[in-house]
Amino acid sequence: MPAFFVTGTDTEIGKTTIAAGLLHAARRAGLSTAAAKPVASGCEPTAQGLRNGDALALLGQCSLALAYEQVNPLAFAPAIAPHLAAREAGVELSAARLHEAVREVLALQADLTLVEGAGGWRVPLQGRENLSDLARLLALPVVLVVGVRLGCINHALLSAEAILGDGLALAGWVANVVDPATSRLEENLATLAERLPAPCLGRVPRLEEATPAAVAAHLDLRPLGIGL
């Protein structure tokens, strides 16, 4: 069943907000959903163990029964780059290990499964590996979340170039307006639409409450071909 790897042009540009919106749109259409965020840092201690807000947001939009540990198998407390957090904790952070964990979620064969990365495309894992190596092992088409602000065109085009250069398909992109005061906003969006070699799945404005339902109202799943 359709599955996609969700990446972004940078950290803190709304990958999870958009991923949760995509999952909500699928659920609203009567489709089953599942998700994974295989590694997360900045997690909070709870009685059940470390929990990450982004992973919990994705879990909340999964229609299939999933344990938190299936969605987020590697959770670290320090709010630092995952490879640094893993090194401090003495934990293996290899693409192969993350691949095995994600395969468990993919095996559920939901109508839509999203695997969300951390940060951007070249976030380091251990050794010389990056999260992009996980995407390559999974061989999933990619959805790129573009945080629309100053510099986003360069970030988006470089990200798309890297994705395609790694042999993966760019299935679509979403314009997430993180800075509504961006100069020449409409011209920037037009340039992105012209230059990015994939369909735009939606333009999400800066929302007062960016709930999955509110975000989903600005998204279109049809270009992903998931049978809506």
Curated annotation (Swiss-Prot):
Q: Which domain of life is it from?
A: Bacteria
Q: What is its EC number?
A: 6.3.3.3
* Residues annotated as catalytic: K37
Q: Which CDD domains match?
A: DTBS (cd03109)
GO CC terms in record: cytosol
Q: Where in the cell is it found?
A: Cytoplasm
Keywords of this entry: ATP-binding, Biotin biosynthesis, Cytoplasm, Ligase, Magnesium, Metal-binding, Nucleotide-binding
Positions annotated to bind ATP: E12, I13, G14, K15, T16, T17, D54, E116, G117, A118, G119, P205, R206, L207
Looking up Gene3D superfamilies in the UniProt record yields:
P-loop containing nucleotide triphosphate hydrolases
Pfam families on file = AAA_26
| Matching InterPro entries | DTB_synth_BioD (IPR004472), P-loop_NTPase (IPR027417)
Record: residues binding Mg(2+): T16, D54, E116
A single Gene Ontology MF term assigned here is:
magnesium ion binding
A Gene Ontology biological process term: biotin biosynthetic process
Pathway it belongs to?
A: Cofactor biosynthesis; biotin biosynthesis; biotin from 7,8-diaminononanoate: step 1/2
Q: Which cofactor does it need?
A: Mg(2+)
Self-association or partners: how does it assemble? Answer: Homodimer.
- What does this protein do, in the record's words? Catalyzes a mechanistically unusual reaction, the ATP-dependent insertion of CO2 between the N7 and N8 nitrogen atoms of 7,8-diaminopelargonic acid (DAPA, also called 7,8-diammoniononanoate) to form a ureido ring.
Q: Which family does it belong to?
A: Belongs to the dethiobiotin synthetase family.
Q: Which HAMAP family match?
A: BioD (MF_00336)
Report the protein name in the record: ATP-dependent dethiobiotin synthetase BioD
